[in-house]
Amino acid sequence: MNTVFPRIQRLPPYVFNVVAEMKKAARARGDDVIDFSMGNPDQPTPKHIVDKLVEAAVRGTDSDYVKPEHLNEEGTHTHRYSVSKGVPRLRRAMANWYKRRYDVDLDPDSEVIATIGSKEGLAHLAFATLSAGDVVLVPNPAYPIHPYGVVLAGADVRHVRLTPEVDFFEELERAIKETWPAPKMLILNFPGNPTTQCVDLGFFEKAVALCREHQIWLVHDLAYADIVFDGYTAPSVLQVPGAKDIAVESFTLSKSYNMPGWRVGFMCGNPTLVGALARIKSYLDYGMFTPVQVAAISALEGPQDCVGEICEMYRSRRDVLCDGLNAAGWKVEKPKATMFVWAEIPEPFRELGSLEFSKRLMDEAKVAVSPGIGFGEYGDTHVRFALIENEHRTRQAIRGIKRMLKRTNT
C-alpha cells in the first residue's frame, strides 16, 4: 500500500504540538508547568454572548416560538444545516462592524464571508486560489498557517525577512524582483503574531501600491485589531482607497470576545477572492452551527465594554510579565498590541537556539513558551510568551526564570 503523502511530507513538526509533548512529559514528572505557550484565551466568553447562544439553540427547536434570527438561510430551524458563507444577518453585522470601526463600505453579499475561525478561511482561500508553481510572499517569522496554508495548497513560499535590523519593504521589493514566476499573492499580519510588530496606515498604503504595481493579491490577517495598548490603533488595509481591487482581510472573534473554541471569523474585501473562498467552502462545509452565528451577531452588535475589559486584562498581564522579566535581567520590550511578548533569548543561552532554550525553561523554570523557530528561521533568536496566565501565576513564572538566570550567571 502506498504510504507516500507528498502534501503532508512538506510540513515540518507543528510548533504547538512539539511544545504540547514537552508539557505532557513535564507534567508526567509532576511538574507544575506555567503555560505561556499557546495564544488560547483563558477567560470565559462574555455572558450576553453565551446567553444568546443558549436562547437560539433552545428556542430554535420550539415550533411555537421561532424568531427570524433563529432560522437558517432556508428559513428552517437552527439545528439543521446552515450555509457555508454565513447567514445574511451575520454577514450584514460583519459589514456594519467595518463601517463603524473603519468607515469601510462592504457589500454583505459579495464582499463578506463568514469563516469557521480565521485559520480555516486563510487555509481554504489558499486552496481556492493557488496551485503548483504559484509563489506566495510571506514574512518570516510568521504565524504557521500563513506559509503552510500555501504549502498545503501545493504552491511555493518565498520568505521575506521581517526582523528589526532590515527594511521590510526593501526585502519585499527584492523578493518580487528575484522571484520567478512572478509572485501571485502576499500575506501580511499586523499587529503581528509572533513578533507583535505594529504598523500605521501609511504602511498599508505602500503595500497596496506595491501589490497593484506588480499585480499581486494581498491577504491581511487582522486577528488582533482590538488587542492594542498605550494609545495605539490598528489600521485596516481596507481603509486604503482602492484596496478592495486587490485585497482581502480576515478577522476573528477568538481574541476580541474570548471565543476561541467557537470558531467564528470572517473575510472581507475583494469580491473575486471572497467569491473563490465561497465557492470552495460550498464543497467543504455547511458553515457554523446557526446558534453560534446568532451569538456572533450579538457579539458584534451588542455591548462592547467586554472588548475593552479583555484588552485591559492583557495590558495588565503584559506589564507584569515584561516588568518582571526586565527586573530579573531578561531584557524585553513591551508590545503595543497582541496577546504576546516576543522575547529575545538572553545572551548566555542564545547559542542554544529557541527550541533547546525552551526545553531549558521547561526543565529549570517550569515555564512553557513557544520556540521562535516554529515561526520561521528568522525567529530562532526569540521565544514567544502568550499572555494566558493570570498575574499570580505570571509572577510565579518570573521567580522561576530569575532563579534559572541567577544559576547561569554565577
Where do the language-model regions lie?
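Conserved core segment of the aminotransferase class I/II
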Residues: 53, 239-240, 244-315, 319-328, ...
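N-terminal small-domain helix-loop-helix segment of the aminotransferase-like
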Residues: 2-116, 124, 300-302, 408-410
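Helix C-cap/helix->beta junction micro-motif
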Residues: 26-29, 153, 213-214, 328, ...
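Active-site phosphate-binding strand-loop segment of PLP-dependent enzymes
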Residues: 158, 162-230
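PLP-dependent enzyme catalytic core of the Aspartate aminotransferase-like
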Residues: 96, 100, 350-353, 360-370, ...
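Conserved PLP-anchoring active-site segment centered on the Schiff-base-forming lysine
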Residues: 128-150
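Conserved glycine-rich beta-strand-loop-beta hairpin in the small C-terminal domain of fold type I
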Residues: 297, 312-322, 332-345, 379
